[in-house]
């Protein structure tokens, strides 16, 4: 159905336009004025709200049908007879019970004398593209006026009125049009349309032929079979100056001044109060991160365009499909009476998995399906307190020798066998970095662990990262076992460590607490068995470590990196279920099929049960460290989950990056001047190290004049795309334990891109901080060189006034900047030592305690007792 204007529908429904406008506002539709168009669904609602009035009963059902009235007599000559129209008597109203003439009268003979009998059945005329509904039936919608230039605007269906039949005028018989082709339906043409009823038309009877739309000899067709007759006014057609007769479309009624004023008011620009939106009463609306106004409108059942206008009045320039930040959504919700709640990422992910009938984080089956599993132990502590050495002693390996700088750069997961009185038992160890830059990695390690082993050096005691690791373990609500390491070193004091940790709530068992302290030496192996026993005792006493191995595997990706030959490789920890080769797996935004699994020694593994760390090959991309992984029934489901997660994260980032910029911000930037920006591209061997490096670099603060911007980061070797991006954005590439490819190296040398390589994280931080300080404008400070007191003034025609001085402190240097101070007041500033002499000899400097002659160039206002201070501006190093 085509669009209809409000005033047209009002005429059709026989109501006023303002009544329809009020109803539209009740329905929540924003309509400016009566000339606005409305959509088909809205028209349907209005028709239901304003049903047509009941129609009067008609005899034999014929009065309700508009019959094809005979047209006025037309002259075939060039002259018309307006006098006959003027002399026509008034029309006589025919009773409704009168039978239509078209049903009983046969057509007379045509010009050739051939008689064609009118059959009693109607002949169906060819239908135009959009047929109009019959008048007796409730109209479903007015047809749109065509593009025919010979037709006048169609009249709107009105309640049936008694048929007016004008009296015939003698002497003016209608001259019929010759037929196009006997027996063939005529094509609807402008001249063949049903004529407009007019006064002065003769009633059909003897001697008056019946004018048919398709030509002579055709029976009258029902009006619903063709287009409503609105034919153009032909020659000799009766009517007024514009062909309006009694049956023509009524002219537009004259509007009062009040009505015109109301229409003018409706044409004004809409304001926020004029937008009809469903108002809330404090209802809670839950929206995901990065939701758009269309999502909000769908929740409250409103038009997105209306929300765009409301947001515009609130000072937000957004579109209906643009991701909006949390503050804007809450502001808009408060304006409309709703409480907007942004769904957390955890709830979003849970709802996403529930849509696929996947439940994350629970064991399936009853108690009988649960079996014991090994404890997962995370080793945490301050940097260089011997965590990796301790694990080496437990595993009898040498992992620390392979770490750059002796500092663990990423998480390592291992499973070891501990010999106990009840037999061998498995323990899974997770080694987390202790450097301050790896805070996020320590937090992840605490979240996936069962027991935290806090390593504290007996000689150093409690350090900053020790406290941070302790807080992570407490936040994860896991039991803590303290390993006091390096007890073999001179100056070791385990008792001091116990006393320090008491301040943080860890009271040793020997002091009446519930925390187990074990003195160990990773170097000599002392206390290793006691530490393993303490871990198992804590697990048996405080934890119920059971899981169901007979379900699809679920767990967490501890670490991931990109291998040149094997592709993305992720170190995962299975928490429940069993992971097998060939399973479809999804971890965060990465998905794939498990092609192979390797243990910590590089040996292939066919399946991994609960608490087992393995390396998984087969992901399509590198998952982020800390992403949960799960096995799904098929690859299609894994792909859909990953794509939806990626789209959700992209919308959240778009919403976060959209920042409101005010005039105050612009003025502030103008006052500060151009901000220097150091652009970086980070590439690393594992995703956790790249994340830690980025977090550490972004924490560098050298003031408001310079800042760091990481434009790209990734895992794997430095590629040509990274170099081209650095060229386009004038960035520096930092490779952490990675090197560039052959062509990438050549391209970087050719384009002059600065590529830095690091294997220890704090070296990268120091270099970037130095580079960032180099972007700052230099800061100078004044350094005083010396002072000289004027004892005598000598006047020279060649050099001007010469001050005979005694150097009181420092050194007076020729060419240095100077100022003249008289009685504590500076009388001359920014002058220079133009000449410096000692006993008629030109010298470059005069030290303290010696006399000299000083010339200050053009400044000659020198008096006895003045003090000449020399100084220089030196660049101040950035702290």
From Swiss-Prot:
Region (G2): 406-410
GO molecular function, one term: GTP binding
Gene3D superfamilies: 1.10.10.2480, P-loop containing nucleotide triphosphate hydrolases, Translation factors, Translation initiation factor IF- 2, domain 3
Region (G5): 521-523
Any GO CC annotation of this UniProt entry: cytosol
Ranges of biased composition (kind: Low complexity): 82-111, 198-213
Gly residues compositional bias, start-end: 228-246
Transmembrane segments: none
tr-type G domain: residues covered: 372-543
Annotated region described as G1, given as residue ranges: 381-388
Coiled-coil ranges (or none): none
Biased composition range(s): Basic residues: 251-260
Residues where GTP binds: 381-388, 431-435, 485-488
Matches recorded under PROSITE patterns: G_TR_2 (PS51722)
Residue ranges, annotated region (G4): 485-488
Compositionally biased region (Pro residues): 119-142, 152-163, 173-197
Subcellular location: Cytoplasm
Statement: the UniProt record of this protein carries the keyword GTP-binding: yes
InterPro entries per the UniProt record, alphabetical: EF-G-like_DII (IPR053905), IF2_II (IPR044145), IF2_N (IPR006847), P-loop_NTPase (IPR027417), Small_GTP-bd (IPR005225), T_Tr_GTP-bd_dom (IPR000795), TF_IF2_bacterial-like (IPR000178), TIF_IF2 (IPR015760)
Keywords tagged on the record: Cytoplasm, GTP-binding, Initiation factor, Nucleotide-binding, Protein biosynthesis
Annotated spans, Disordered: 48-261
Region (G3): 431-434
Pfam families in the record: EF-G_D2 (PF22042), GTP_EFTU (PF00009), IF-2 (PF11987), IF2_N (PF04760)
UniProt similarity note: Belongs to the TRAFAC class translation factor GTPase superfamily. Classic translation factor GTPase family. IF-2 subfamily.
PANTHER family per record: TR-TYPE G DOMAIN-CONTAINING PROTEIN, TRANSLATION INITIATION FACTOR IF-2-RELATED
Protein name: Translation initiation factor IF-2
